Amino acid sequence: MKDKYIIYFISRTKANMIKFIENKLKENNLTELIPTHGNILTALYESDKKLTMKEIAKKIGKDKSTVTPLVNKLITLGYIQKEKSITDKRVTYISLTSKARDIEDTFNFISSQVRETAYKDFTPEEKEEFLRLLRKLNSNFKMENEK
């Protein structure tokens, strides 16, 4: 039975979380954004400064080649902007625009709804244990991939 396999549950949970986020974006008239844009916006909101593509990729745990099209889309949508470093023309910084700042409270509210839903009916101990096990699972695959 498929339900016995952890990968099945992880996959279904991810799909359900994405659908939940898509619904929340729609409810808040942010339909031009997709869930994966959230990682980039979060990195920029939390740093509260300009970041390079490399720094964004590292913060969200993705390859630069994966981040580039997402950043380009956010630029097209007007949420972020690129600017060249004054001291080193090889370096390009990414920063939030006023449009992104205008949705920051809504974005944070959606993020809190995701967390609340994820941990609904979890005791504090269950939450800690769940996070510990997820970190361990992630570490197992990360170590194998780095061989």
Residue spans for each PLM region:
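C-terminal regulatory/oligomerization modules of transcriptional regulators
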Residues: 1, 124-147
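N-terminal leader segment of winged-helix/HTH proteins
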Residues: 1-30
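N-terminal positioning helix adjacent to the helix-turn-helix/winged-helix DNA-binding module
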Residues: 2, 6, 36-37, 99, ...
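Residue-level marker of regulatory loop/turn positions in helix-turn-helix DNA-binding domains and
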Residues: 2, 33, 111
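Alpha-helical linker/hinge and terminal dimerization helices associated
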Residues: 13, 17, 24, 60, ...
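N-terminal helix-turn-helix DNA-binding core of bacterial DNA-binding proteins
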Residues: 19-66
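Short, locally clustered residues in the helix-turn-helix/winged-helix DNA-binding domain
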Residues: 42-46, 108, 135
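Charged, amphipathic alpha-helical coiled-coil/dimerization segments
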Residues: 72-132
